[in-house]
Amino acid sequence: MDARFTAEQEEIRRTLRELLLKRCGPEDLRAAVLTPAGYDPALWEALARQLGLPGLALPEVYGGVGCSVTELALACEESGRSLAPSPLLATAVLGAPLVLALGAEAQRAELLPRLASGELTAALAVPGAVLATALGLVGDNGGDWAGGGRAGGVQARQVDGVWRLYGQAAQVLDGHSAGLLVVAAHTGGFARSRTLLYLVRDGSAGLVRVRQTSLDETRPQARIELRDVEAELLGDEDADVAGALAGVGDMAAAVLAAEAVGAADRALERTVEYVRQREQFGRAIGSFQAVKHRLADVYVEVQAARSAAYYAAWAAGTDAATATATATGTGTGGERVGGLALAQALEALRRAAGEGIQLHGGIGFTWEHDAHLYFKRAAGDESLFGPVHRLRGYAAEVARLFDRKGDGSRAEVTV
């Protein structure tokens, strides 16, 4: 891994930071989350048309920019700094990569250019509030999670050659406003059951979408009800859905880690700015050793999380771009570290946001102050994509850290 950024990568960061400083300040953010869509359409158009963010990591042949996961992670790190509400995560990180990975050529040619331009937004609908499981981050994504068990789920069946979906999914990121839903559904009955992905278009008969109240208002979520809705199978029935979801999940975890690092970094910056100005006992409270040590610990944690996020993005991008990475020795050999990076980044964000609230004193606990927005982002993301101990536990399980040899000793593991 080359830790140096190219001039193009630095330009992406600089341009996006300048735009978000102008267009997504605290007042803009609070106004955007109150709109029906949950984000500012004008800002989304600027991100899509001027900067090409939705298509940043999509191939040029489908209207994308042709960059790697690293560029997408850097862009999301900047959006995380401002907590910018937008369909970028749902569209560019979850929806479009699945269409690219599993879609038939006709589906790719129709949908990816529209997704890359920002004209069309997408959302991944997973039943049972098990998004992290479906993405292979905290458990077996080859299991029967789409069926939902007693909690319901989404069932798919063919009627006269047409796929129809029944069921519901909750906590769907941007599900209330997306023009395209990628729905995970259970099909084939219990003897031959499997999970496939289906495309549901906006305005389909029987589709009911309701925006839910969420802990983090900058991450709008929805409940999706499918009442005999006509759907289109994504790809074919032999598609490796579990493998595609796990691949997208690792990439998404790396990007989310970078976004969390951006939020943590900005929360720390704001706190440092405040303790330099706030005076007590005739001097700035930032001059007190106890305050310095707390902020120094946060700084170390944020920088460590940043390194982990960058490495995870590089690893995900290398494996996605080079099919022969293992054979040539130029890639990571199929190494998936996104979940570990996300766990470290979420911890750093939670620590930075929590210390920010405490060191701001009474004002940090008020609704009018922005400190709670960062804490809600940390808690909301951990609820959706974690929790942290499960991210680490599953990574240890995959790496076989707890396996023993025949003599009872631990298996040798390369980390």
Where in the sequence are the language-model features?
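Alpha-helical interface subdomain recognition
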Residues: 1-80, 114, 118, 250-415
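N-terminal glycine-rich flavin-associated loop
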Residues: 86-106
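FAD-binding glycine-rich core of flavoenzymes that anchor FAD
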Residues: 102-122
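A short core secondary-structure module
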Residues: 125, 168-207
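Intrinsically disordered, low-complexity terminal tails and inter-domain linkers enriched
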Residues: 128-160, 188-189, 318-333, 405-411
